[in-house]
């Protein structure tokens, strides 16, 4: 390259790139390093950006940085060697060495410092460690977080990788699908032995971690310290203990079993059947090592002698026990075909101190249901009056607007940008899911049977005695499925069974039947208090549903096809019912659709003949009338027919890669754009094809999205019905707010670190750095767990090509849980303290580090700090009164709340 300033011809050789002579050859060692760095300085002075400089050398920015680091290290190595020679061979002191080399004395001291030498050689040391691992194991994961395991910076790791690439090792990027999040992937970066092909990295069983992760359980750790240490719960799933059927009684339909269908009654005080701190739980209990019970477990005080478990069923008397119970699955990792919750198994100890596994395996327990999201699904609200719909959607809009206004007032730009990004994503999601603001004091509760209650009563300890509440079960067919009941918290029987339950209500079987045939095996309802301000429309039950029992009407027939895709089928019939409600279907038509939905929801679980139900109820005829549409080319389609059903309807779009661009003027997301600098068209779409195995045709690769996400105007999905228009207005408002948030985000500046704050909050900054290091060190372990889970999934699919998506999802979840436990993958959210938040606000943390902290912190906690709210903190006297009232057994949760002037949620916090 000709340099007119020096009138000499230079040729800048770059490692693994161009150059006539080997790297480091010539009269002066490392002269090419010096030339390379000098050229970078020249290009910088000419105004070129780092990216442009990298491109001028034919490198990516990552490769460029690695080459630059190597050049700097080699230049420094020359300086260190020179300084040492002058000191050791010529006897010069630091001052003399500095004058000789043209450096100041502090730089000389740094060159001769052994710690500095270690830092300089960090990349070489890392390269040696990685090389050894490749030689021993093969393909090695070198993705995010590995640099922390090596205790070096990412730049030093990239430098080490560049060194290894010079030796012929190859680096590839890729991805591993997240086991429990279809459509999402964990990025993969690996280094492989020379000659490895890119496709080989997708044999996940052969991708190894740099370090070996051996995880000791808490039990092993504690027992090593104390041999008498007692563990309450297994650290992972243990094959269940089995109940002797001699201890089990079945209560059949004729004996009252239907009134408590799905309830498992337990003898109180029996060690191997103890529910722990819960009054109730959704459980699985193995019986005789070949069958199992599933349902809601509660305590009972009237079991016959010799019986410890009583199961209620709607099956007729004379049905053999093995037909009442479920057969265990052949998979020892999942014998119940359902996932047991973390901590859902426990141990008990006999009089001699011997450990035994409890018979109880919990799917969910008291407190789990009350944590469900509180909002109003369109499936319910769209069937109510327009004034209620408008009110709740307007509240949701105002809540979002207030949140946006608050975020815009925040002064910390990094926090502001992070929360604006999160806010925009939430708004995009809100537009698709169409969920309105919750009604006052609504909550999700699990239902338990109290046969002695009247058809107009409910035992609901979290609501006021005497008030009226509406119950809504999902999937929701219409207003004819909504019972309005009066709270009776004085009912002695209910109080003895349920007590001050955190998230359960008691009803009788007639009420459950009206709720689209709900069972007492873990079914839930949304409870909404009704009054003059909150009027819920409830209409009489449909005559076509009276006495309808899907299990009796459509039992299994030999040779019939058993449903596998419950979620898909429920989506189809739910959309049909929604469209029928909006388009004014008759009661008879609605009854047909709802009867079929009742069959569908239990078809897989109870092997019901849903195909016959589809014929008997003429579902095809209902689709023809309420969902038929003709496109612009004259093609007939059946499916989602209104905005409410179309919003979440899937649509295939060209496959995309990476994140969308944000339009600077509008804030809208763009997958294609015209580059303002070059005028060239840029695209995030992936132009890939594959051969369809079924048709043999070559087709373009696509991905799934939703109709609402893909449209810029929700009204394109509406038929013009007033209720649809209310939801269209809401969706467009959310889309607009999301765009505003993104526009605000890209116009927000960067954080300027404050020197005084950095010094003042040195301790807090160090604490946050340490917490971040722990959080980021989990990344390689999580990748290893994902790789292991995917390897298991591949083997399962190979052995069971007909496995359902639902079953595969369960098995993947279980495989991932097990893998995480094995390698110790446990993402620990950074718990930011008030003092650390003070340091963040003062500018003691750099922009880049704060971004990383926020990505690994509890975002709700960050939001809480950034938006201080008045929190209810009770005095010790009030806490004492609260506990006294609860422990007396004479007051419900709602009555305690009323007496103390606080909410029931605050009472539950102190329970």
Where would I find each of the regions flagged by the language model?
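Short alpha-helical "recognition helix" segments of helix-turn-helix
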Residues: 52-55, 96-101, 146, 895-897
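Short basic helix-loop element that most often maps to the first helix and adjoining turn
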Residues: 42-49, 87-92
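Amphipathic alpha-helical packing elements
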Residues: 2-33, 502-535
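Recognition helix of helix-turn-helix/homeodomain-like DNA-binding domains
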Residues: 65-73, 113-114
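Key DNA-contact positions within bacterial/archaeal DNA-binding proteins
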Residues: 62, 106-109, 155, 905
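Low-complexity, small/polar and acidic-rich linker and loop segments
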Residues: 1-5, 62-66, 76, 107
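Beta-strand-enriched accessory nucleic-acid recognition/scaffold domains that flank the catalytic cores
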Residues: 77-79, 84, 89, 118-497, ...
């Amino acid at each position: 390259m000709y340099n007119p300033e020096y009138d000499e011809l230079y040729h800048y050789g770059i490692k693994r790139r161009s150059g006539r002579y080997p790297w480091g050859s010539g009269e002066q060692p490392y002269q090419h390093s010096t030339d390379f760095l000098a050229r970078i300085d020249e290009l910088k002075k000419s105004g070129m950006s780092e990216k442009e400089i990298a491109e001028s050398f034919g490198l990516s920015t990552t490769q460029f940085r690695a080459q630059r680091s190597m050049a700097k290290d080699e230049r420094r190595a020359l300086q260190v060697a020179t300084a040492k020679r002058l000191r050791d061979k010529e006897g010069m002191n630091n001052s003399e060495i500095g004058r000789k080399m043209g450096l100041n004395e502090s730089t000389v001291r740094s060159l001769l410092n052994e710690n500095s030498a270690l830092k300089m050689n960090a990349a070489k040391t890392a390269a040696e460690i990685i090389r050894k691992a490749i030689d021993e194991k093969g393909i090695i994961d070198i993705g995010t977080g590995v640099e922390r395991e090596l205790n070096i910076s990412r730049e030093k790791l990239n430098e080490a990788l560049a060194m290894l690439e010079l030796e012929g090792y190859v680096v590839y990027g890729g991805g591993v699908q997240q086991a429990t999040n279809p459509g999402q992937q964990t990025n993969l970066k690996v280094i492989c032995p020379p000659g490895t092909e890119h496709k080989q990295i997708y044999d996940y069983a052969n991708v190894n971690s740099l370090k070996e992760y051996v995880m000791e359980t808490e039990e092993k750790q504690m027992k090593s310290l104390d041999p008498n240490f007692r563990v309450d719960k297994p650290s992972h799933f243990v094959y269940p203990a089995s109940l002797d059927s001699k201890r089990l009684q079945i209560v059949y339909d004729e004996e009252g079993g239907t009134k408590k269908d799905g309830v498992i009654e337990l003898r109180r005080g029996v060690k191997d059947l103890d529910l722990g701190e819960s009054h109730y739980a959704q459980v699985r209990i193995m019986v005789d090592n070949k069958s199992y019970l599933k349902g809601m477990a509660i305590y009972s005080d009237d079991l016959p002698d010799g019986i410890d478990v009583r199961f209620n069923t709607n099956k007729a008397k004379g049905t053999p026990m093995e037909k009442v119970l479920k057969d265990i699955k052949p998979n020892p990792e999942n014998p119940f075909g359902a996932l047991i919750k973390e901590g859902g198994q426990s141990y008990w100890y006999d009089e001699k101190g011997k450990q035994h596994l409890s018979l109880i395996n919990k799917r969910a327990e008291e407190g789990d249901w009350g944590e469900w999201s509180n909002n109003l699904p369109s499936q319910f609200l769209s069937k109510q009056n327009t004034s209620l719909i408008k009110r709740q959607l307007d509240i949701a809009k105002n809540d979002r607007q207030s949140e946006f206004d608050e975020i815009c007032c925040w002064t910390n730009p990094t926090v502001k940008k992070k929360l604006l990004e999160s806010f925009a994503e939430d708004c995009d999601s809100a537009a698709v899911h169409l969920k309105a603001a919750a009604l006052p004091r609504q909550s999700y509760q699990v239902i338990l049977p109290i046969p002695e209650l009247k058809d107009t009563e409910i035992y609901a300890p979290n609501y006021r005695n005497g008030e009226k509440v509406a119950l809504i079960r999902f999937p929701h067919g219409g207003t004819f499925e909504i019972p309005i009941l009066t709270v009776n918290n004085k009912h002695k029987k209910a109080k003895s069974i349920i007590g001050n339950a955190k998230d359960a209500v008691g009803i009788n079987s007639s009420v459950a039947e009206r709720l689209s045939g709900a069972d007492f095996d873990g079914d839930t309802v949304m409870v909404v208090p009704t009054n003059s301000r909150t009027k819920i429309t409830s209409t009489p039950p449909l005559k076509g549903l009276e006495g309808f029992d899907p299990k009796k009407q459509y039992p299994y027939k030999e040779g019939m096809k058993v449903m596998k895709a419950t979620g898909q089928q429920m989506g189809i019939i739910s959309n049909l019912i929604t469209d029928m409600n909006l388009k004014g279907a008759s009661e008879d038509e609605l009854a047909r659709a709802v009867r079929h939905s009742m069959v569908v929801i239990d078809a897989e679980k109870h092997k019901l003949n849903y195909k016959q139900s589809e014929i008997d109820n003429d579902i095809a005829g209902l689709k023809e009338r309420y969902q038929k549409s003709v496109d612009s080319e004259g093609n007939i389609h059946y499916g989602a027919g209104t905005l409410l059903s179309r919003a979440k309807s899937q649509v295939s779009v060209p496959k995309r890669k990476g994140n969308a661009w944000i339009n600077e003027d509008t804030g809208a997301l763009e997958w294609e754009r015209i580059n303002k600098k070059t005028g060239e068209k840029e695209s995030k779409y992936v132009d890939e094809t594959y051969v369809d195995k079924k048709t043999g045709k070559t087709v373009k690769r696509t991905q799934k999205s939703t109709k609402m996400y893909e449209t810029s105007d929700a009204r394109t999905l509406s038929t013009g019905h007033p209720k649809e228009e209310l939801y269209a207005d809401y969706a467009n408002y959310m889309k607009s707010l999301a765009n505003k948030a993104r526009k605000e985000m890209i116009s927000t500046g960067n954080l300027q670190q404050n020197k005084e704050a950095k010094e003042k909050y040195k301790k807090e900054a160090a604490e946050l750095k340490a917490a971040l290091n722990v959080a980021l060190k989990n990344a390689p372990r999580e990748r290893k767990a994902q790789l292991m889970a995917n390897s298991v999934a591949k083997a399962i699919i190979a052995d069971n090509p007909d496995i359902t998506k639902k079953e595969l999802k369960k098995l993947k979840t279980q495989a991932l849980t097990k893998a995480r436990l094995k390698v110790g993958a446990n993402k620990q959210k950074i718990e930011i303290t008030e003092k650390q938040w003070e340091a963040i606000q003062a500018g003691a943390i750099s922009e880049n580090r704060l971004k990383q902290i926020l990505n690994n912190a509890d975002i709700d906690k960050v939001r809480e700090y950034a938006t201080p709210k008045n929190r209810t903190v009770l005095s010790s006297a009030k806490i004492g009164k609260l506990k006294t009232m609860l422990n007396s057994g004479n007051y419900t949760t709602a009555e305690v709340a009323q007496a103390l002037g606080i909410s029931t949620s605050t009472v539950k916090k102190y329970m």
